[in-house]
Each structure stands twice: as structure tokens, then as C-alpha cells.
Design a protein with these regions (language model features):
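Gly/Ser/Thr-rich phosphate-binding loop
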Residues: 473, 500-505, 514-574, 586
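Conserved ATP/PPi-binding loop(s) of AMP-dependent carboxylate-activating enzymes
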Residues: 581-584, 595-632, 670, 713
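Conserved AMP-binding/adenylation subdomain of ANL enzymes
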Residues: 434-454, 458-501, 516
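Conserved AMP-binding/adenylate-forming core of the ANL superfamily
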Residues: 258-316, 333-338, 389-392, 430-431
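AMP-binding/adenylate-forming catalytic core of the ANL superfamily
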Residues: 332-335, 339, 349-354, 503, ...
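Conserved pre-ATP/AMP-binding loop-to-beta segment of ANL
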Residues: 257-260, 375-376, 381-383, 392-415, ...
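Structural core segment of the AMP-binding/adenylate-forming
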Residues: 207-213, 320-389, 710
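Conserved AMP-binding A3 loop
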Residues: 272-277, 411-435
């Protein structure tokens, strides 16, 4: 009945608009111009084929020289200049979309100084994990809560309003709101505009926008989301022509020259801010500089630059020139450099002046015939070029030409962790950067108005997951702190100080965070937290959420890939799971014979590359100079990750371990991660690594190598306690029959446990 009444009212208004158009002698085209609509839109409104927005009716009344009441009601409504009464449930509905209902409480009152609205805002779980959409309009706004809870953001400040609470703010300040507390929120909004108030003002203020933002990268990326903003599918377009430095960095600089690209702190916390224009010009100078040194397309150039801001100038310059960037950590020693220089045929290196790194390079140089150019950053040294002084002498323009690198040309190489042998060289094309759009947009939850902080140092692949490609594809800024040693108490105050909105760190650092008293720090600016690098123990997840209210969204990928599995924005997550497969990757779990395993059974995570999707943007091109190793992991249309997981009935994946790490005991296949997670629940355990130990009867048994917290003594009684705890909290056959206490666990340079040395 109510729907029918409203429909009849709108039909009557549409008929009066048509009548008045004929009386005034306007054509549909003229009225479309008067109401700022297209002719097609105007015709639909007048014919009653579409709901009539209040703004449209208001503009029609102005064009006809009528009061809006005359047009809406068909009478003069003179009394509406002194007062108006709106009975319960009788307000004029002006918007009902995206979980929002807005009713104007005084639609016919003349010469209003403000617009009062009755607003119902549905609770949306997905909205709890996204940044609040912010908007502006002229004047001021007053909101009072009638029922439920409303989370309101005004500028950088956030308030939770309960029943009876109210807020008044300048609506020219960016603001937005969502319902919280698990149920809908009903409130009264009064919009006081500097100009004539209309329905459009409150819609822009109150109705939340969709999650999609218009990015320049949409020439190359097409995403489809559901009504909650969850990613359904994503395709890449024009990827064969793509070059991140030209098509993203330079394009943003051209359109938004003053937009912040990076906020950088050096080790002394000296702050520098770089716009996209700064990055564009500095990378052009770097490209011209490298070219003058004889570096050319296809040359391999190593970057050992910690978190120095010059890293961004250099890598973008190499991307423009076509030389292949090879990031590496400053922890390398002589033999590490010697192996890498020769394995990749490194011809030039940009190296930090900090510490002993340059000396280690010089020691390795004598056995590295391909290395001809050494460039120092942050200092000077005999036999080295000085980057900071020399690159500034070159032009800040570097034109794109017909032979500029793009698409399938090699852009980047990473050395793998080397947990089972010498590190391999994973080679990536220019399409790799596009693959990280999902990483940033749907996992990190990066938006153009935010600042993202990924902890990782630039020598690791994870740094480029979170400090460059995806974040700038989303036109967001990155925060970089060039610290030497991780200290939770040093980093935690930075979130509030620099209004960091999204954050990513490995599980180890979250473990360090939860050992701090987090109540001492203001972490309210953080909208979203993520982790990757190793599986996250559920206990760490629970403790971090208990102390901060933030859930940690886990993701999975490799040096050879972009994000392949993850807990994405808009989807519910299960604590301890890896999440679901990313739409751009066709994932399958297989047994040792390559057959797909049923749900609930362990299988190796593989990526199909022989389907219509082909090789996805983000998957590596192969191991450089190592065809045999490439064929070993990539054959019969499958790329084998060597990681084992199982999938539940809802499609979530659960990590078991590396294929080489799975323990085979008495016919059981036991993943080390599950046992490690249980042992890590014990308050006196600092670190734990589970591995296989040979056994004459069972073939293998579970061995737990444990590092205790300072002050805790490892005893036989403690071993028994740990064994009994595992028996109680998981299947008894999985308990560690061998428990050893160690001062530290053997790890790779990247910090991953080397299980075959336990």
C-alpha cells in the first residue's frame, strides 16, 4: 500500500511537470538543459519511468517560476511559509539505495534555511573493514542519534555516537559515516547550507559511495565487485603496452602534480615528502644518468639501498631505461655477493654507504668479471660514483620512445630465499606491477586518500608488494621509515603522528607488537592490517585483535608470484586460514601424481597456466639462466608452488607447510605449521620450529625445536608439559616425540626457518 501511494504521488508530479512544460513552451531538450540532465534522463523522469530526485523537481520549479510546493502538491501551500508538520512515517523519501533510507521531514516548507532528514543506515559487515568514504559540501551539518550506533569521521578524527548523542560540524571538512555495533542506526540529519539546501547535499554527505574509485590505471585494469565491494573478477587490458614508470607514475604526476607519493623518514626521523611530480622528475634524471654510465636495456643492475628514498628514484629510472632491477638486502656478505653477481651477470650496483656493505662488494668484485660500475648512495668512496651528486646534473625529462620497455620485457629479478639450496633468480616482466593492483586494493585496502606502511626493507620482494606498485596504481601514498633495527616501541607512535591508514608486516613483528602495552599508543588511524611472509599463528591474531580491535588479514604469495591467496576486503575471514584464491589465479590442489585432491585433503598449491586465462599478470617468466629448475616447477600446464594446503567446504585454504617439510609418520602426513601454532600458544615460548626426525619404526617422528623467553629454563619436566599440551590441543599422533631447546633457530637471510638444519 505504501509503495503504491508513493508511486501515485510521483506519477502526479511527473504529469504536472509535463503540463507545465507545455504551458511554458519548453522543449524536452530545453528542460534537460534547465535541470542539468540528458534528454534521455529528462524524458524518463517526465514519463514516470524513473524516480524523481528532489534536486530535479527543485530545478523544474525554478524553470517554471513556481514554488516547489505548487509543483509537488498542486496548490499554493501558503501556510507552509510559517510551519509544517510531518507525521510519523510520512516524510518524503528522497533516497533508498546501498543500505540507506533518507526521508525529508519538511519537503514543502518554503524559504528553508536548512534541510531536516530522517535517516536509516543499515549495518554492513563489509563496511567495517573498509575506509569510510569521505565527501564535502558547503555549510554545516547536525546529526543526532535516535537508535543504534554511528561511526562518524570528520577530517582525521573519528567519533562513535550512541543513542542520544549528537554532532555538529563544518561539512566543508571531508566527512563520512557508517553504522556500527551490529545493527542499523537511525538518526536525524539537519543540513545547513551556505547556499540553498537541497536533497543533493545530504545525499553526498550521507549516502556512502561505492568502493570503486576512478583510477588512471583503469585503462589497464578492469575489476568487477559485488554489492559489498568484494572482488568478483579482474581482467587486464593493454598489458602488452604497460610500463609502470610511464603509465602510472608519470600519468599521475601529469594529472595530480602535487599529490603525495611518499612520506619518508630517515634513520634520524628527518622527514621528506615526495609528490608524484618529484618521483617523475627524479626518475627521469636517474634514467639519463644511468644511460650516461653505459647502462642499457637488458643490463642487470643490483640495488642494495635499505629503505633510502633514492631507491625509488633508481628503480623507476631503470624501469624507464629498460635495465633490469635486482633488489638485494644489505645483510649480504662477500660470498653472497660473489654468487649473485655471477649468477645474474650483474653489470652495475647501487649500494648504500651505510655500514660495511660497500667493502663486502669490493671483496666480491675480484671474482665477479661482469661487474663494471659501482655507484654509492648517501656518501662518497674511492672507486665509486656518487649518485647523490652526479644524478642531479642530468635532465629531468626522459621521453618515451617506440623501443621503450613494456609488457613482456624483463623488468625485475628477485633472488629466492634459498631454503633448500642456492637461491634461484625469479625473473618478472613489466606486467608484474599490474598484478599487484589486487594486492593493494583488495588486500591492503589502499585508497587514494590514505597512507600505507609496509615494514619490509627494499631488498626483499615483499617491499615491492607494499611500497611501490599496487599502492601507486591505487594512487595512494606510501610511508617509509629507514630504521636500522626493528623496535616496536619506536615504530608504534608513528601511526598516530603520520596518520597511517593501512599497515602490513610479517607475523614476527606482530608478535613483537603484542608484547608491548598497546594501550599506550593511539592506533585509531589504522583502518586495515595485513600480514604475509609466513603463516600467522592464530594466538597472535587473537591477542592483536583483543588489544587493538583490528583483525589481521592474512595473504599468501611467493617471490615468483603476486598475491595468490588472501583474506580480501568485503569477504568474511576465518582465523588461521590463508583465505581464498585470488580471481586472477586459477588455483588447484594436487597430489604427488598431479591429480586434483578433494576438499579436506592435503594437496600442493598449483597455478594453472593452460586455461583461457593463460599466464596471469604477476606470475614470473621463469628462473633466469636455469631452464632445468624452471621445468621442474612449471610443467604440464601447472606451476608448482611446493606449498601444501587443504581447502574447506567454504573454499578457504589452510596452510600445512612446504612440500619438503611435511612429516610422514606411521602413514600419517603431518604439517609442521599446525603443531607450531599450538606450541606458540604457550606463554614461555618465543619461537618454535617443527621438523622431521628419522625413526626406525615410524619412518619419521615430529621434532620440536624451541626457543624459550628470557629467564625460562628448559627442563625435562617442561618437555613433558609441552608434549601433553600438544596432545590435548590437536590429534595425539601429531605430538612432538622429540623436544629440544635452542638459543636460536637457523634462518635464511630473509628470516625464514631452515627446517633441514633443525
Amino acid at each position: 500500500m505504501e509503495t503504491s501511494r508513493v508511486a501515485n504521488q510521483l506519477a502526479e508530479v511527473a504529469f504536472r511537470i509535463k503540463e507545465m512544460r507545455h504551458i511554458c513552451g519548453f522543449t524536452e531538450a530545453e528542460m534537460a538543459a534547465n535541470t542539468d540532465t540528458t534528454v534521455e534522463q529528462y524524458h524518463a523522469y517526465e514519463a514516470g519511468l524513473a524516480d524523481l530526485p528532489f534536486t530535479f523537481i527543485h530545478k523544474c520549479a525554478l524553470a517554471f517560476g513556481l514554488g516547489i510546493t505548487d509543483l509537488l502538491e498542486g496548490h499554493s501551500g501558503a501556510h507552509l511559509m510559517s510551519y509544517t508538520v510531518t507525521r510519523k512515517g510520512a516524510g518524503q523519501q528522497t533516497a533508498k539505495e546501498q543500505g540507506i533510507s533518507i526521508c525529508n521531514l519538511a519537503p514543502y516548507f518554503r524559504n528553508k534555511l536548512a534541510e531536516p532528514y530522517y535517516v536509516t543506515y543499515e549495518y554492513d559487515e563489509a563496511q567495517q573493514h573498509r575506509p569510510i568514504h569521505l565527501t564535502t559540501h558547503s555549510g554545516q551539518e547536525f546529526d543526532i542519534i535516535l537508535s543504534g550506533q554511528l561511526k562518524v569521521q570528520v577530517g582525521e578524527h573519528t567519533e562513535i555516537l550512541n543513542e542520544g548523542d549528537s554532532i555538529l560540524y563544518n561539512s566543508s571538512t571531508p566527512h563520512g559515516m557508517i553504522a556500527v555495533g551490529g545493527k542499523e542506526c537511525v538518526f536525524c540529519a539537519v543540513v545547513m547550507s551556505g547556499e540553498e539546501a537541497d536533497e543533493r547535499s545530504v545525499r553526498e554527505s550521507i549516502v556512502r559511495a561505492g568502493t570503486s574509485e576512478e583510477y588512471l590505471c583503469q585503462k589497464f585494469v578492469h575489476a568487477v565487485e559485488d554489492e559489498k565491494g568484494a572482488l568478483k573478477s579482474l581482467t587486464f587490458e593493454n598489458a602488452d603496452e604497460y610500463n609502470f614508470a610511464f603509465d602510472t607514475v608519470d600519468a599521475i604526476a601529469a594529472k595530480y602534480p602535487d599529490k603525495l607519493a611518499m612520506l619518508h623518514l630517515d634513520h634520524n626521523k628527518v622527514e621528506r615528502r615526495f609528490t608524484f611530480t618529484d618521483m617523475s622528475k627524479a626518475s627521469n634524471r636517474a634514467a639519463n644518468y644511468f644511460k650516461s654510465l653505459g647502462i642499457k636495456k637488458g643490463d642487470r643492475v643490483m640495488l642494495v639501498l635499505k629503505r633510502h628514498y633514492q631507491f625509488w628514484f633508481a628503480i623507476l629510472g631503470l624501469h624507464k631505461l629498460g635495465a633490469i632491477a635486482v633488489p638485494a638486502t644489505n645483510l649480504l656478505q662477500e660470498h653472497d655477493f660473489t654468487y649473485r653477481f655471477n649468477a645474474a651477470g650483474i653489470s652495475a650496483i647501487l649500494c648504500t654507504a651505510d655500514g660495511d656493505v660497500a667493502h663486502q662488494v669490493e671483496l666480491a668484485e675480484k671474482d665477479s668479471p661482469t661487474l663494471t660500475t659501482k655507484i654509492l648512495v648517501g656518501g662518497s668512496r674511492e672507486g665509486w660514483h656518487n649518485f647523490d651528486e652526479e644524478y642531479l646534473m642530468y635532465r629531468s625529462s626522459f621521453p618515451r620512445t617506440a623501443d621503450s620497455p613494456k609488457g613482456d620485457d624483463l623488468m625485475l629479478m628477485f633472488f629466492t630465499s634459498g631454503t633448500t639450496g642456492y637461491p634461484k633468480i625469479a625473473a618478472h616482466s613489466y606486467k608484474y606491477a599490474l598484478g599487484h593492483y589486487i594486492t593493494a586494493k583488495y588486500w591492503h585496502c589502499v585508497h587514494s586518500d590514505g597512507i600505507h606502511f609496509t615494514i619490509s626493507e627494499t631488498g626483499w620482494g615483499k617491499a615491492l608488494w607494499g611500497k611501490l606498485y599496487g599502492q601507486w596504481l591505487c594512487e595512494g601514498a606510501v610511508f617509509t621509515y629507514d630504521f636500522d633495527k626493528f623496535d616496536a616501541a619506536d615504530i608504534l607512535p608513528l601511526f598516530k603522528q603520520y596518520n597511517i591508514t593501512t599497515f602490513c608486516a610479517p607475523p614476527t613483528m606482530y608478535r613483537m607488537f603484542i608484547k608491548e602495552d598497546l594501550s599506550k599508543y593511539d592506533l585509531s588511524s589504522i583502518r586495515h592490517a595485513t600480514t604475509a611472509g609466513e603463516a600467522l599463528n592464530p594466538e597472535v591474531f587473537r591477542q592483536f585483535e583483543a588489544q587493538t580491535g583490528l583483525q589481521i588479514y592474512e595473504g599468501f604469495g611467493q617471490t615468483e608470484t603476486t598475491l595468490t591467496i588472501g583474506n580480501l576486503v568485503g569477504n568474511a575471514q576465518k582465523i588461521g586460514s590463508m583465505g581464498k584464491p585470488i580471481p586472477t589465479y586459477d588455483l588447484v590442489l594436487v597430489d604427488a601424481d598431479g591429480n586434483e585432491v578433494p576438499r579436506g585433503e592435503n594437496g600442493e598449491i598449483c597455478i594453472r597456466t593452460d586455461t583461457e586465462k593463460g599466464v596471469p599478470c604477476g606470475l614470473f617468466a621463469g628462473y633466469y639462466r636455469d631452464e632445468a629448475q624452471t621445468k621442474e616447477v612449471w610443467h604440464d600446464g601447472l606451476y608448482h608452488t611446493r606449498d601444501v594446503a587443504w581447502q574447506d567446504e567454504d573454499g578457504y585454504l589452510w596452510y600445512v607447510g612446504r612440500a619438503d617439510d611435511v612429516i610422514k609418520s606411521s602413514g600419517y602426513r603431518i604439517g609442521p605449521f599446525e603443531i607450531e601454532s599450538v606450541i606458540m600458544e604457550l606463554p614461555y615460548v618465543l619461537e618454535c620450529g617443527v621438523s622431521a626426525a628419522p625413526d626406525e619404526i615410524r619412518g619419521q617422528v615430529v621434532k620440536a625445536s624451541i626457543v624459550l623467553v628470557k629467564g625460562k629454563e628448559g627442563t625435562e619436566e617442561l618437555k613433558k608439559e609441552i608434549q601433553n599440551y600438544v596432545k590435548k590441543h590437536t590429534a595425539p599422533y601429531k605430538y612432538p616425540r622429540i623436544v629440544v631447546f635452542r638459543d636460536e633457530l637457523p634462518k635464511t637471510i630473509s628470516g625464514k626457518i631452515i627446517r633441514n638444519k633443525l
